Amino acid sequence: MSGGSVAFVNLGCRVNRVELDDIAARLEAAGLVPTAPAAADAIVVNSCAVTGEAEAKTRKTVRRMATLAQAPEVIVTGCVASLFASELSGLAPNVTVEADKSLVAGRVISLVGQGGGVPSACEGVTPTGRTRPAIKIQDGCDNRCSYCIVWKARGRGRSLPAVEVLSRLDETCGRGAREVVLTGINIGRYRDGGLDLAGLLDLVMARSDVGRVRIGSIEPPDVTERLVDAMARHGGRVAPFLHVCLQSGSDATLRRMCRAYDTAAYRQVVAYARDRLPKLSLGTDLIVGFPGETEGEFEESLAFCEEMAFSRMHVFRYSRRPGTPAATAPRQVDPREMARRSRRMRELARRMRRSEAERMVGSEQLVLVERAGRGVTGGLFDLHLDPSVPVGSLVRACVRSVLDDASLLGRLS
C-alpha cells in the first residue's frame, strides 16, 4: 500500500508534544509528509488522561478524526491509550490503539505504507513546526497525589542516560535549534547513576554549544540549592525561568492533595531562587475547587499566590479523575463556586503578569525569534520586534514598552 501524508493531534502536556515530535520525525524520515487532519491518510492522536475532562476530550477527538471524509487511519497513543485501550479501539473500525509510543511510527507505516513525498517547508526545527524543541530526559512518576492518575498511565520514574541526552541535544542543535527545553513528567527526580538534574545541566553546558537551555516544570522539593546554583553559574545560557508546581496555596488543601511540601517550604525555595537569580520569572500550576476547599482555604491560596508574584499561572478548575482518591472524597465543590474562584484566580494571574512585564521595561532580554516579528524572552514573555530578524535566531533586545496583552515591544540592542 502506498503511503502519503500524516497529521498529528496533541492533547495534554509538554511531554506529550515532545513525544509527538519524535514520532513525527520518524515518519518524516520514512517519507510521510505532515499535513492537516482533513487531508491526511493517517492521524496520530497523543491522548491525555490527567482529568476526567481530558479523557472525554480524547474520546471526542478520536471520534471526530475517525469520521473525517477520507476515512483516515487513526492511531491513538498516550495516557488514555495506556489505561483504556479496548474502549478506544471500539470507537470506530479505523481506530488503532498503540500505547507504546516507540512503536507508533511502525504502526502508521504498517497501515498506510512508507511515503515518497518531500516534506513541506515550515518554520521551526521539528516536523510539527516548533522552534523551541524539547528533549524528554525523564518519564514516569513515583508520587501518589490524590487527584492524579498519571503514575498509573506512565509507570515508575525512569531517566534517560546522560550520554543519550547529549546525543539528542547534538541532533537537535544540528537541525538549527538555538533553544532546547529539558522536560519530563517529574524531571527533578532525574538520576543517571550519581548524576542528578544539576549535574546534567552542568554537563550539557560543558559539552554543548546550545544557545539557551530551559528547564521544564518541576516539583518544589526538587528545586534544590544545587540546581539553582547551577542555573546561576551558567548565566544567560540557562533561561531565568522556573515553573514550580504549587497546586494550592493552602496547607490544608495541600495535605488533602497528598503533596510533598507545604507553603513554608515553597516560600523558602522561591526566596533562595530569587536571591541567586535576580532576573528570575516564576510560573506555576494552580487548582481551584479541590474537594473540601473552603472559602477560607481559597482565600489563603489566593493570598499566597499574590505573595509569590507569579508571572505565569495555569489555573485549573478541579475535574474528577475516576480511579483517584479525590474523585470520591467528601465535600465536592459546586461547579458554579469553582467557576467563581477560577475567575478570581485568573484575574490575579493577569495582574501579576502585567506587573512583571512592566518591571522588564528598559531591560535587555535574550530573545528567541519564533516567528516573523515575534520572539520569546527567557522569562516566557512574548516580545514584538523587527520582522526582518530571522526566525530561529537568538538575539538581544531592549524592552521599550508593554502592550495591552502583557506582551512586550522591543528593539534589537
Feature map (PLM): residue ranges:
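Conserved SAM/AdoMet-binding glycine-rich loop
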Residues: 74-75, 83, 174-295
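Glycine-centered loop/turn positions within well-structured domains
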Residues: 143, 188, 251-252, 373, ...
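Short acidic, glycine/proline-rich loop/turn micro-motifs
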Residues: 151, 254-257, 325-329
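Active-site proximal loops enriched in glycine and acidic residues that flank catalytic Cys/His/Asp
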Residues: 184, 217, 246-248, 284-288, ...
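Hydrophobic, well-ordered secondary-structure elements that form the walls
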Residues: 244, 285, 305, 313, ...
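Contiguous mid-protein beta-loop-alpha structural module that forms a pocket-lining wall or clamp
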Residues: 293, 309-310
